């Protein structure tokens, strides 16, 4: 543990006379607790860095809540009653399994991941054909192939302040089971007053959220795009997707569909190819999950704003 810490953060935290190595995912929470930030912190020597944090922690107000995992500090969170609310990770998934099995026919666990700062699980909601019935009809009305699709739901949580308990409606599409994100998640933040009862209430919103999300995806079929490459580049840049990812997605889109006019729906599926590329490259589950949420934000942008002609240097 010590050797690993020396190679990563190089920091230990002293708490009530005991010393705990600091994990990578804890650094931002410590900086937040100390109320400091800035790129310059990354450039100073490690002993100077530690001294700055120590001086700021001395004047930090309130209590702190530590998350310890496998001998290391994974997070330093607000410990006052109005700050961070603990939502037990095991209970989150137990409640989710119970609700999904009771309310969705043919619910099947597909997989998940656990990392030091995040855990996630994915379930297929097979047997709920009505969830996709309207979407399939829209696809056929627009001469699109209503290929094999499965409604799925992802539930993600963190006990290090990385995220709240989030419920994501999603699709698996085609033979490869490509992931298609369906908009913003149902969120429960780890704020004062958050409880498992609140999470149970959010679980009851899944069906309605799915119907709304599917309508949002269907709306993209009605948005004609005259300049798909510029539009795709503009959207992905607006979302903050890295140049490497967006260039690879655009090149794949050009190879498959060319540069002829299409719909926003076609481009959205093209952008979603980034998720498959990341999975093939062996990206961590948390990185893929974050990218799913990033791509989903495209459902709420003004696509016409990015449908511009000309040879634009991106």
Regions from the PLM with identified roles:
Residues 1-95:
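Feature for intrinsically disordered/low-complexity regulatory segments and propeptides
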Residues 77-78, 84-314:
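Intrinsic disorder/low-complexity polar-acidic segments
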């Amino acid at each position: 543990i010590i050797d690993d810490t020396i190679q990563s953060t190089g920091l230990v935290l002293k708490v009530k006379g005991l010393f705990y190595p600091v994990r990578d995912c804890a650094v931002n929470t410590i900086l937040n607790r100390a109320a400091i930030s800035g790129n310059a912190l990354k450039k100073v020597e490690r002993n100077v860095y530690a001294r700055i944090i120590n001086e700021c922690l001395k004047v930090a107000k309130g209590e702190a809540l530590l998350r310890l995992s496998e001998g290391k500090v994974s997070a330093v969170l607000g410990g006052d009653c109005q700050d961070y609310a603990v939502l037990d990770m095991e209970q989150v998934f137990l409640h989710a399994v119970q609700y999904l099995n009771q309310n969705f026919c043919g619910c099947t666990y597909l997989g998940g991941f656990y990392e030091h700062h995040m855990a996630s699980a994915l379930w297929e909601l097979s047997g709920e054909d009505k969830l996709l019935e309207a979407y399939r009809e829209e696809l056929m009305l627009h001469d699109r192939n209503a290929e094999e699709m499965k409604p799925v739901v992802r539930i993600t949580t963190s006990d290090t302040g990385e995220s709240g308990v989030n419920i994501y409606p999603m699709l698996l599409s085609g033979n490869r089971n490509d992931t298609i994100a369906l908009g913003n998640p149902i969120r429960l933040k780890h704020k004062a007053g958050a409880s498992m009862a609140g999470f149970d209430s959010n679980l009851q919103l899944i069906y309605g959220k799915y119907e709304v999300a599917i309508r949002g995806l269907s709306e993209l079929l009605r948005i004609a795009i005259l300049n798909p490459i510029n539009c795709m580049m503009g959207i992905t840049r607006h979302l903050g997707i890295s140049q490497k990812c967006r260039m690879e997605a655009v090149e794949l889109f050009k190879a498959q569909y060319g540069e002829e006019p299409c719909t926003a729906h076609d481009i959205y599926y093209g952008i979603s190819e980034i998720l498959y590329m990341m999975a093939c490259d062996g990206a961590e589950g948390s990185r893929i999950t974050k990218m799913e949420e990033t791509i989903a934000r495209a459902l709420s942008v003004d696509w016409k704003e990015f449908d511009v002609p000309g040879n634009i240097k991106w």
